[in-house]
């Protein structure tokens, strides 16, 4: 599933369960409830810190790292046990960490993190040092954008803000496209849902939708739900 609402509910599954009228308090797991292939990156006895890779899981053309919890407080944690390479359920325990006091933490292939809580266990903050090629002449020539940078497109109704967003999503030199369609943008995202599956990704030769994630919240949804899309987007891209 690659289309979500602001709370990261997968919209196709939400439609199957609720139909056209959303029920109060519905929340679905954004991670597919199935088995995945796990490959360990550590062995029993290895020391680990917050954010260290414990294993990896492939999904399509990408490889996800299974990391030690971001909130590990001290440096005394070690790998007590880890699963061998194989296929396991997404919620199954694949590794167990233990500190000097005997406290244990069981790790599965997924864990939750508050969307508004910053992640501080990084070694270095990378600064933008490479130009993002969008293949849109007016941007690449007159207003070049750095990879990891930010730019804004203001304008009145009909100025072409959404068209520019869609063109950039189709042509930009990036590994994955994440579109946060909040408000009016979500009403126009239907074009993306119809067009992207039919477009061929020049980098992989596969469907462009395979590396695209869309978060939809229309103007009729509460402001809080639309605001949540921004936080959800910022966490997904990590």
Sequence positions of predicted segments:
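Accessory, often N-terminal, substrate/partner-engagement and coupling regions
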Residues: 1-49, 53-55
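P-loop NTPase nucleotide-binding module
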Residues: 136-184, 234
């Amino acid at each position: 599933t690659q289309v979500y609402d602001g709370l990261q509910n997968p919209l196709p599954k939400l439609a199957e369960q609720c139909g056209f009228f959303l029920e109060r308090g519905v929340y679905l797991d954004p991670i597919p409830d199935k088995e995945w292939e796990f490959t360990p990156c550590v062995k029993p006895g290895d020391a680990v810190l917050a954010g260290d890779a414990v294993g990896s899981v492939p999904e399509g053309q990408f490889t996800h790292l299974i990391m030690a919890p971001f909130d590990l407080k001290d440096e005394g944690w070690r790998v007590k046990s880890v699963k061998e390479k194989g296929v396991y359920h997404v919620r199954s325990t694949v590794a167990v960490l233990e500190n000097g006091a005997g406290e244990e933490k069981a790790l599965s292939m997924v864990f939750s993190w508050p969307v508004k809580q910053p992640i501080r266990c990084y070694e270095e903050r990378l600064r933008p040092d490479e130009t993002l090629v969008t293949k849109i002449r007016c941007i690449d020539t007159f207003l070049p954008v750095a990879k990891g940078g930010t730019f804004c497109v203001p304008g009145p109704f009909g100025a072409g803000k959404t068209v520019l967003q869609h063109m950039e999503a189709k042509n930009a030199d990036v590994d994955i496209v994440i579109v946060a369609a909040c408000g009016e943008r979500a009403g126009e995202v239907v074009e993306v849902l119809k067009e992207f599956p039919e477009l061929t990704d020049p980098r992989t030769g596969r469907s462009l939708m395979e590396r695209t994630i869309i978060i939809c919240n229309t103007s009729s949804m509460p402001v809080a739900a639309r605001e949540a899309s921004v936080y959800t987007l910022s966490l997904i891209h990590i």
